[in-house]
């Protein structure tokens, strides 16, 4: 039996989807969840990330290919990561270099390529998360960046499945609002 009570869970992107999943598994422990830019709409490998820019589309298309995709994924480096991630920002100058350095520490670890490709290939709208959304019973706030990768139809579908009254929008923000609009995110969580 969990001793944790009145927990607030905040997640962005895949983390937002995980917040919803945890709330279904442990509703008595969860007071509220905040879902920022939930990444729940892919119909093919890395679709959402590919919406960011041409560079991301080119790289992820090739990473998603059978067999040769492993080679493309193994070539990932700071330059590639930065150019893919910049497609998730309204203002790409807000992508911190030290954060990129931190992410790059994983690139050469054993199993990285396998796990990276596995997450993007399994994380799609057919993985059951949409059905799980209907089971979320805890209070929640759904928030999107004004320039998130999700299309309006994706946002409305998620809102409806979660039975949310509405979703909030952070202006001048892409998919990575935690990094790009820290103050606005903080204010939403504190509200």
List PLM regions with ranges:
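Conserved acidic catalytic loop of the alpha/beta-hydrolase fold
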Residues: 1-7
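Gly/Ala-rich beta-loop-alpha elbow adjacent to hydrolase catalytic centers
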Residues: 11, 15, 19
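Flexible "cap/lid" loop of the alpha/beta hydrolase fold
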Residues: 24, 32-67
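Conserved alpha/beta-hydrolase catalytic His-Asp/Glu region
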Residues: 45-48, 70-134
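Short beta-strand/loop motif that positions the catalytic acidic residue
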Residues: 136, 142-144
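Acidic catalytic loop of the alpha/beta-hydrolase fold
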Residues: 146-151
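Catalytic histidine neighborhood in serine/cysteine hydrolases
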Residues: 154-175
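Catalytic histidine-centered segment of alpha/beta-hydrolase-like enzymes
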Residues: 173-186
